[in-house]
């Protein structure tokens, strides 16, 4: 077995180190195949050391350009991979070829498993992928690698990332490989139930990011007998994430570059609201347009849901706790609109796990990142209470608890929820955002900047002093942090005016460039794309 692993070309050591970030591994280099195949070994190890529970392997690079791909490992309960196993994965991905089998055995022994590789409890892994051309080949190579370890592999084919989370969770709950259709049946059934109560099914235009969303919307519409009430704006031949998708809309602060957006049909459509997904359907951004584009990001979605769910709890006279978990990138106006006597607002560090763990501290925990990734967590105490009631408010809460994914943001589930609850774009206009600006700076080593839990720079301390002076002079706030998914430093600034927000962001970005060995072009704002 050891020799078989060493001889496998798919398992050769990558030329550069790779590390499991907030979105798993992502790359566009020639090492991509080997990084993903080595990382898939962790899914086998996690399964065989945990009574053969089914572990998920999702091949996707989400909102990244089409030439990228990546891998996310899904734990037995549908959660993201535990941090301890992330560290194990980095060891497996980056070790020398002759040490690969030895490192795998070390992990087995650390889990009190004395079996040899490929022996003992049989591992079980399920695969899924997005629509990238490279996905099928990568899945086939992973299947080949895992086959050498006597690991059972089932392939769900093209799925959304949240769909695979759902399927893994359901597989282990029912102790069987469930049919792929179970996911869509759950959404269709609950959407039908919710819209029949609220009488809502807001028509929306859709930006699919030229990704898997198009396929899944057609599948869902088929189950709903053509009643989903939507229109896709993308060209069927469009390139994944190119000038479109949730990340493009959010970061560029503009509507996607789609020919259909300039049509008279869209400009005259009632409410003119569009939902923009990302490549693997775990992010959702709403916008109006195409002219005078107004963007409703994760902050707007969180505030709408918080106020709506609060009203439901008030109607049933519930004393359940309700919390809203936002990001340090969230706009201060979103925090200010939530009354402190009704909500506990918590700020979480970037990374989905941080948001989910904070949300689970409440009976109802609403969490959203500004990028449109978010969900609502319901405690068992909350579910028990709402199950006892028979009012309309109880019924809506029961359905929401079934639709919102408890482990990860599901943009498709969120989409149908908003369709059923909203009457128009006005429902998302709960506050007026303070002007803000986000820039990225490339430096020699992004990890040379150390920040604490509140995004205060610890090293170099002089950088934080500069940030404080600039923020005070312009009456705003700003912070910097190394990106968890890209080799850049992110700079955020927020001020009472757009001009000051831009100026503050530029000044801080320049300090980062000057003090931390910036490389390439100096920071600047491109206004030509507006």
UniProtKB/Swiss-Prot annotation:
SUPFAM superfamilies per the UniProt record, alphabetical: Phosphoglucomutase, C-terminal domain, Phosphoglucomutase, first 3 domains
Active site: 62
Alphabetical list of Gene3D superfamilies matching this protein: Alpha-D-Glucose-1,6-Bisphosphate, subunit A, domain 3, Alpha-D-phosphohexomutase, C-terminal domain
Alphabetized InterPro entries for the sequence: A-D-PHexomutase_a/b/a-I, A-D-PHexomutase_a/b/a-I/II/III, A-D-PHexomutase_a/b/a-II, A-D-PHexomutase_C, A-D-PHexomutase_C_sf, A-D-PHexomutase_CS, AMG1_III, PAGM
Cofactor binding annotation: Binds 1 Mg(2+) ion per subunit.
Record's keyword terms, sorted: Carbohydrate metabolism, Cell wall biogenesis/degradation, Isomerase, Magnesium, Metal-binding
GO biological process terms held by the UniProt record: carbohydrate metabolic process; cell wall organization; UDP-N-acetylglucosamine biosynthetic process
UniProt catalytic activity: N-acetyl-alpha-D-glucosamine 1-phosphate = N-acetyl-D-glucosamine 6-phosphate
Superkingdom: Eukaryota
Annotated residues for binding of Mg(2+): 62, 278, 280, 282
Residues that bind substrate: 369-371, 481-485, 490
Metabolic or biological pathway: Nucleotide-sugar biosynthesis; UDP-N-acetyl-alpha-D-glucosamine biosynthesis; N-acetyl-alpha-D-glucosamine 1-phosphate from alpha-D-glucosamine 6-phosphate (route I): step 2/2
Signal peptide start-end: none
Cofactor(s) this protein cannot do without: Mg(2+)
The enzyme's E.C. designation: 5.4.2.3
GO MF annotation terms: magnesium ion binding; phosphoacetylglucosamine mutase activity
Pfam entry (one): PGM_PMM_I
Record's function text: Catalyzes the conversion of GlcNAc-6-P into GlcNAc-1-P during the synthesis of uridine diphosphate/UDP-GlcNAc, which is a biosynthetic precursor of chitin and also supplies the amino sugars for N-linked oligosaccharides of glycoproteins.
Family: Belongs to the phosphohexose mutase family.
Protein name as annotated: Probable phosphoacetylglucosamine mutase
Organism, as annotated: Encephalitozoon cuniculi (strain GB-M1)
């Amino acid at each position: 077995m050891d020799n078989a692993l060493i001889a496998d070309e798919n398992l050769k050591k990558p030329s550069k180190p790779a590390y499991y970030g907030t979105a798993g591994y992502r790359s566009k280099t020639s090492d991509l195949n080997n990084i993903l195949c080595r990382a898939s070994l962790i899914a086998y190890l996690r399964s065989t050391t945990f009574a053969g529970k089914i572990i998920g392997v999702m091949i996707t690079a989400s909102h990244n350009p089409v030439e990228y791909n990546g891998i996310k490992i899904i734990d037995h309960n549908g959660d993201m991979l535990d941090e301890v196993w992330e560290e194990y994965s980095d060891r497996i991905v980056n070790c020398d070829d002759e040490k690969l089998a030895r490192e795998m055995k070390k992990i087995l022994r650390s889990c009190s498993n004395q079996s040899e590789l490929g022996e003992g409890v049989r591992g079980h892994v399920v695969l899924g992928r997005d629509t990238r051309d490279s996905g099928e080949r990568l899945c086939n190579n992973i299947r080949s690698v895992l086959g050498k370890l006597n690991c059972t592999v089932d392939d769900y084919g093209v799925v959304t990332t949240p769909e695979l989370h759902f399927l893994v969770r359901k597989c282990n709950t029912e102790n069987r490989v469930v049919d792929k259709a179970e996911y869509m049946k759950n959404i269709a059934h609950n959407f039908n139930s919710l819209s029949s109560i609220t009488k809502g099914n807001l028509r929306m235009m859709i930006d699919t990011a030229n990704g898997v969303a198009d396929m899944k919307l057609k599948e869902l519409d088929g189950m709903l007998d053509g009643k989903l009430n939507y229109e896709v704006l993308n060209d069927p031949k469009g390139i994944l994430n190119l000038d479109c998708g949730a990340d493009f809309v959010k970061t560029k602060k503009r509507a996607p570059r789609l020919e259909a957006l300039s049509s008279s049909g869209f400009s005259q459509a009632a409410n003119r609201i569009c939902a923009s997904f990302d490549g693997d359907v775990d992010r959702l951004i709403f916008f109006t347009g195409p002219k005078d584009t107004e963007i409703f990001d994760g902050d707007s979605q969180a505030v709408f849901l918080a106020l709506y769910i609060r009203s439901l709890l008030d109607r049933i006279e519930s004393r359940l706790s309700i919390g809203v978990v936002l990001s340090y990138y969230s706009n201060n106006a979103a925090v200010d609109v939530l009354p402190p006597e009704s909500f506990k607002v918590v700020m979480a560090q970037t990374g989905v796990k941080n948001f989910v763990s904070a949300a689970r501290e409440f009976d109802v925990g609403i969490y959203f990142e500004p990028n449109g990734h978010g969900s609502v967590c319901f405690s068992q105490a909350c579910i028990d209470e709402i199950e006892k009631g028979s009012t309309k408010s109880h019924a809506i809460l029961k359905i929401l608890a079934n639709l919102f994914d408890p482990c990860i943001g599901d943009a498709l589930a969120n989409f149908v929820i908003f369709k059923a609850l909203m009457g128009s774009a006005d429902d998302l206009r709960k506050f007026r955002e303070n002007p803000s600006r986000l820039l990225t700076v490339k430096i020699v080593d992004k990890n040379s900047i150390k920040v604490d839990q509140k995004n205060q720079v610890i090293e170099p301390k002089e950088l934080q002093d500069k940030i404080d002076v600039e923020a005070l002079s312009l009456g705003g706030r700003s912070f910097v942090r190394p990106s968890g998914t890209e080799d850049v430093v992110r700079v955020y600034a927020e001020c009472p005016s757009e001009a000051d927000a831009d100026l503050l962001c530029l000044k801080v970005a320049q300090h980062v460039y000057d003090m931390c060995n910036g490389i390439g072009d100096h920071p600047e704002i491109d206004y030509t794309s507006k």
